[in-house]
UniProtKB/Swiss-Prot annotation:
Species: Psychrobacter cryohalolentis (strain ATCC BAA-1226 / DSM 17306 / VKM B-2378 / K5)
Protein name in UniProt: Type III pantothenate kinase
Cofactor: NH4(+); K(+)
Gene Ontology CC terms, in alphabetical order: cytoplasm
UniProt keyword terms in alphabetical order: ATP-binding, Coenzyme A biosynthesis, Cytoplasm, Kinase, Nucleotide-binding, Potassium, Transferase
GO biological process terms, semicolon-separated: coenzyme A biosynthetic process
Catalytic residues identified in the record: D102
Binding of ATP, residues: D5, L6, G7, N8, T9, R10, L11, K12, T124
C-alpha cells in the first residue's frame, strides 16, 4: 500500500507491506506544487508496486486534480479520504464540511471505544479534540508555535529577533526568551486548562512539535507519531469491509 498525506506545507508518504509494516517513508516540502513533487517520486513508487493508494489531502480541488493526474500514471487504484461525521468508527458533533481531513484522521487513528481521549495535533496548527468513547465532542484550533512567532515578528516593529528555542515556560529576561516562552506557554497553558476541565481524558499528542510541547504539560502524555497513517489504514480497511 502507498499512503499519502498532502498537508499545508509538506507531502508525506508511507509504503507498507502486506502486514502493514512500513518499508519506506519520507516527508518533503511541496511548495504548493505537490503534483510536481510526486512526479519525481513515481519511479520510487513503481519499484515497490503498491496495489492501492490512499490519500489524505487538505489542499484545494485544483491541486488535488493535478495530484490525481500524476498518480494516474502509475495505473494503480487510488482514493481520497472524505470526512464523514457519521462514520461508524467515530461519530462527530462537528460540521464535517469544516473538519480538516488530517485532523479527522488523527482522531480516527487514536480512537478507542473504551476510553475518553484528548487528541492533540502539533503541526502547522495545534488542534485539540475531545473524544468520549468514540464520539467526537468538538475541539480547539490554535496557530502553531512557529506561526505565532512569525505573526509577532511580522506585525511588531519593536521585536526583530526571529530565532530562538521553545524550551522553557518560565519568565524570560530577554525579549527573545520572553517571546519564545510566552508563545510556548500559551499552548501549554491551554492544554493544561482543557486537561483540568476533562481530568478523565487520556492525552495523546502527535505531529512535529509534539515532543517540544509535551514535556511542559502537567499531565501524562502519550506521544504517537503514527496517528495519521493509522487513521488512513483504518479508514480504508473499514471502507473495504463495508
Amino acid at each position: 500500500m502507498l499512503w499519502l498525506d498532502l498537508g499545508n506545507t509538506r507531502l508525506k508518504y508511507w509504503l507498507t507491506d502486506d502486514i502493514g509494516q512500513i518499508v519506506s517513508h519520507d516527508a518533503k516540502q511541496h511548495l504548493q506544487a505537490p503534483a510536481e513533487l510526486l512526479m519525481g517520486l513515481i519511479d520510487r513508487f513503481e519499484r515497490y508496486a503498491p496495489d492501492f493508494i490512499g490519500i489524505s489531502s487538505v489542499l484545494g480541488d485544483d491541486l488535488n486534480i493535478k495530484v490525481s493526474e500524476t498518480l494516474s500514471r502509475l495505473n494503480i487504484p487510488f482514493e481520497f479520504v472524505h470526512v464523514d461525521a457519521n462514520y461508524p468508527l467515530m461519530k462527530s458533533a462537528y460540521n464535517d464540511e469544516q473538519l480538516g481531513c488530517d485532523r479527522w484522521l488523527q482522531m480516527l487513528g487514536a480512537v478507542d471505544r473504551t476510553k475518553r481521549q484528548c487528541v492533540i495535533g502539533c503541526g502547522t496548527a495545534v488542534t485539540i479534540d475531545l473524544i468520549d468513547h468514540a464520539e467526537h465532542l468538538g475541539g480547539y484550533i490554535f496557530p502553531s508555535i512557529y506561526l505565532q512567532r512569525e505573526s509577532l515578528f511580522s506585525g511588531t516593529k519593536q521585536i526583530t529577533i526571529s530565532n530562538g528555542t521553545f524550551d522553557n515556560v518560565s519568565q524570560g529576561l530577554t525579549t527573545q526568551d520572553a517571546v519564545h516562552r510566552g508563545i510556548l506557554l500559551s499552548i501549554v497553558g491551554a492544554i493544561n486548562e482543557i486537561s483540568t476541565r476533562h481530568p478523565n481524558f487520556e492525552v495523546i499528542m502527535t505531529g512535529g512539535d509534539a515532543a517540544i510541547i509535551a514535556q511542559h504539560v502537567n499531565r501524562p502524555v502519550r506521544l504517537r507519531d503514527d496517528l495519521l497513517l493509522n487513521g488512513l489504514a483504518r479508514y480504508f480497511d473499514h471502507s473495504k469491509q463495508a
